[in-house]
Amino acid sequence: MNEKIIKSENDELSVSFQNVKSVCVCYSIYPLLQFLLLMDENMIKKHTCYFFGSEIPYNIRCKLPCFCYETRPAKTFFDKIKRIVTKIKLRITKDSLYPFLKDADFYAQDFGYLSILLGNRPYSMLQEAPNHLNFVGQEDSVEFQRLKRKSKSLKGRIESFLYGSIAAGYDGNNSQCKALYLTEETNAVVTQNKIIHVDSLKSLWEKSSESKRKFILSVFDLTDDDTEFLAKYPILFLSQPWVNDCYIKEDDYVSLLKEVFEYYDPKEIIIKCHPRDTFEYEKYFPDIHVFSKPINMQLLMLVAFNTKKAVTFSSSAVDCLPENIEIDWFGTPTHKLQKQTDDMAFIFNRAYNKINWKI
């Protein structure tokens, strides 16, 4: 009987089912970067199977031995029903499809579709974004209270029955989560009775070997040309995937952008797209340069990229920037959008300029 092999699509890496020792579950590239920095090079290349949501860009996931599932929000009624069926099917078949899940160590973003893979097994939680638990893990936060209500609701109980207990108790807020890997300190209530590991991305990067650093840069396709191109512009606009995530309509998003860009010289500003953001900025703002490679700001900072000013609606990425970089923070103009994006929950650890909306 032939041994089953998981290959990267670029054919450079492979791991047999028998050799899988760890499983990495990610929807976004911040926890993927964190995982690659936490593990040794041998583990990340030869003994890990990656399960990615479709939000992970193809040019990244094709370089790692992985399985990818369509996890973007279902828009039509038919798509929503189809998604429910495929999730139930995955819960029933996961152990026969992927027998290595029974013995592997799990490192995961623990919400949504792919949390089904965890079943009732213990796992370690990777951090979704900078300061994530400071936003969602506080008892008075919007997200914490929403999850609390969901866990007691009929919908939450049905989802827990269909998909597993984590469906209504993610972000580490369950008994299966044994450890939290964080990039900063937090006093979030979900940290109680768990093993806490705190290592900044910078400290993990500095501890990494030169060969591992090169491998990580190759995975994310970050080159010297990229950093030199970005450094030409003194003002960096950090976008957010609001249209992709169905938080806002395209026309409304363009209106917000127009007001923001009125404050700056188009020759001095560059749009640095969020890794999930596929919005066509060139179509509406042909005079402004765009950097659309799916690379997170934190990785750019690790390779000594710098700028004079960062501008954003409410991107948490600005909190990783050094004090010498000025920040213009616009926030969100409507209460509905604030609730959707958790803008109101953002906790700043540094000085910034709050820009008021005219609309």
Regions found by a protein language model. Give the residues of each.
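Active-site and donor-binding regions of nucleotide-sugar-utilizing enzymes
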Residues: V23-Y170, A317-D319
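Short acidic-hydrophobic, aromatic-tinged amphipathic segments that line or gate anion-handling sites
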Residues: C68-T71, H289-I295, F346-I359
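Catalytic binding pocket for nucleotide-activated donors in carbohydrate/polymer assembly enzymes
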Residues: D319-I359
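N-terminal beta-strand-loop-alpha-helix module at the start
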Residues: S8-M43, P234-S239, V254-F261
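A nucleotide-sugar donor-handling region in carbohydrate enzymes
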Residues: D140-Y233
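Short hydrophobic beta-strand segments
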Residues: V15-Y27, C49-F51, K102-Q109, E228-N244, ...
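Conserved catalytic-core segment of nucleotide-activated headgroup transferases in glycan assembly
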Residues: F215-D224, I235-C273, D277
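Donor nucleotide-activated moiety binding/catalytic core segment of transferases
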Residues: R276-E323
